[in-house]
């Protein structure tokens, strides 16, 4: 079980709300979010209700202001607790609908283009585990949660384009 606390003001000040499960709409509990404390679990925060908009991956720790989680604003409107997974396996494809070159990955990759020699990745099949996909190399840029399942095109994971720079397993739990 996870635990996360959202604070309206920086430095863990102001009105706060404790959460231990997925929430599709946090708007009734606070109007803005400027700091977060993750006591346990790994979480994905979303700028919009219903798990939409920019996504931010947080693990156990203190985040005294939204820049600490690479946020663009103080808007956090939904959150998802990421379940524990002991094994990780993902297939990545060069083209939509699982076409083109395919590579299977079981570990983190800080620079997908250097490792696999193609720059865009249009589809994914997550066989096992939960992953964070980053728009840029070295785990930077926009973040996307990939849960077990099929992602036939970049819109399926919430991206605006097929630019993918790095991929990391979610392993740090409780």
UniProtKB/Swiss-Prot annotation:
Keyword Ligase: no
PANTHER family: BETA/GAMMA CRYSTALLIN, GAMMA-CRYSTALLIN E-RELATED
Protein name (record): Gamma-crystallin E
Signal peptide: none
Disulfide bridge map: none
Top-level division of the source organism's lineage: Eukaryota
Pfam families: Crystall (PF00030)
GO biological process, one term: eye development
Region (Connecting peptide): 84-87
Beta/gamma crystallin 'Greek key' domain: residues covered: 2-40, 41-83, 88-128, 129-171
Tissue and organ distribution: Detected in the superior olivary complex of the auditory hindbrain.
InterPro entries from the UniProt entry: Beta/Gamma-Crystallin, Beta/gamma_crystallin, G_crystallin-like
Single annotated GO MF: structural constituent of eye lens
Function per UniProt: Crystallins are the dominant structural components of the vertebrate eye lens.
Family that this chain belongs to: Belongs to the beta/gamma-crystallin family.
């Amino acid at each position: 079980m996870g635990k996360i606390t959202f604070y309206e003001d920086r430095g863990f000040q102001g009105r706060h709300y404790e959460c231990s499960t997925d929430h599709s709409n946090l708007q009734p509990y606070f109007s803005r979010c400027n700091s977060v404390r993750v006591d346990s679990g790994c979480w994905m925060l979303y700028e919009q209700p219903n798990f939409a908009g920019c996504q931010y991956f947080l693990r156990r720790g203190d985040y005294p202001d939204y820049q600490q989680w690479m946020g663009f604003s103080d808007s956090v409107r939904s959150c998802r607790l990421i379940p524990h997974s002991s094994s990780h396996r993902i297939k990545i494809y060069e083209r939509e609908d699982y076409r083109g070159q395919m590579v299977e990955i079981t570990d983190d990759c800080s620079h997908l283009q250097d490792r696999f020699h193609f720059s865009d990745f249009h589809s994914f099949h997550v066989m096992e585990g939960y992953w964070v996909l980053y728009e840029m190399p070295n785990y930077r840029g926009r973040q996307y949660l990939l849960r077990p399942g099929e992602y036939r095109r970049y819109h399926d994971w919430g991206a605006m384009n097929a630019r993918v720079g790095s991929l990391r397993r979610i392993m740090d739990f409780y």
